[in-house]
Amino acid sequence: MQADILDGKQKRVNLNSKRLVNCNQVDVNQLVPIKYKWAWEHYLNGCANNWLPTEISMGKDIELWKSNVLSEDERRVILLNLGFFSTAESLVGNNIVLAIFKHVTNPEARQYLLRQAFEEAVHTHTFLYICESLGLDEKEIFNAYNERASIKAKDDFQMEITGKVLDPNFRTDSVEGLQEFIKNLVGYYIIMEGIFFYSGFVMILSFHRQNKMVGIGEQYQYILRDETIHLNFGVDLINGIKEENPEIWTTELQQEIIEMIQRAVDLEIDYARDCLPRGILGLRASMFIDYVQHIADRRLERIGLKPIYHTKNPFPWMSETIDLNKEKNFFETRVTEYQHAASLTW
């Protein structure tokens, strides 16, 4: 053997030794062999959706916002929607970087988490771009989670879920610790991204369906496509951890998760009532009661729990929008051509 060749073959990763959490014996820096193909597929799908908000024209939105066409109630919906999303994406990004990434010990899952964290940064950039374009008070929008009770209540709820996992002494190598980690994943993937965000998408995309605020609507369609992948990854991660650690999925944990989701539904309904005190064309607060309960049931089912509300979807067009997003070529609507690495100059 040549002197400069090390005998390190025994450190090559065995596929069957990989686990999603609590796997210190496997080198997390070695991506291959890939065991969790779903994680890699989510990463590839995310990379196929590269975009920046500045690639989308806001000209028509600016013109409409400065006109008298939008009612005060319509403006209220848009402003409170931006007030929630502007910091919510940062909360999700911080939880990925500071809480989830540390405790996920699988490289292909981590690869997607890095991609997701970047996307959360792009989403936060999006809300700044919208505020700047419309000439809104950026400080008021980005501080809404401290000034608006319905928004603060949702974000405080999310921060409660993060607290224990952010503790430097937190560990996942006990049943109780891993159960706490699962609750964190449910809080952010199922509740924040799977319930709170989807309710917010309905509000803005309903304007887009009426050919109003089309630039914002285009950006929200991008975000919706990202968030659909985020939700799918989160569901797969939760179910994967459950499968590898069946002892954690106790009746008590299941009941805790159901109660978390019930609380989230109540918070989202309060927020919808704040956004829509009188209702606007195509949207009423009462419709959001049904919608939030409907999607909560769908999220419960995806992690192996029974539905509890049994309400119908008052916005069937949202399902169509999600399906269309899988096929639509957003690149055709961009105002600037996407710069590939080969075209960059130094």
Swiss-Prot record:
It is an enzyme of class 1 (oxidoreductase). Fe cation 2 binds at residues 120, 193, 227, 230. It holds the Pfam family Ribonuc_red_sm. Fe cation 1 binds at residues 89, 120, 123. GO terms for biological process: deoxyribonucleotide biosynthetic process. Gene3D superfamilies: Ribonucleotide Reductase, subunit A. Keywords: Deoxyribonucleotide synthesis, Iron, Metal-binding, Oxidoreductase. Signal peptide: none annotated. Its cofactor is Fe cation. The active site is at residue 129. GO terms for molecular function: metal ion binding; ribonucleoside-diphosphate reductase activity, thioredoxin disulfide as acceptor. Binds 2 iron ions per subunit. It catalyses: a 2'-deoxyribonucleoside 5'-diphosphate + [thioredoxin]-disulfide + H2O = a ribonucleoside 5'-diphosphate + [thioredoxin]-dithiol. Its EC number is 1.17.4.1. Belongs to the ribonucleoside diphosphate reductase small chain family. Provides the precursors necessary for DNA synthesis. Catalyzes the biosynthesis of deoxyribonucleotides from the corresponding ribonucleotides. Tetramer of two alpha and two beta subunits. This is Ribonucleoside-diphosphate reductase subunit beta. It comes from Chlamydia muridarum (strain MoPn / Nigg).
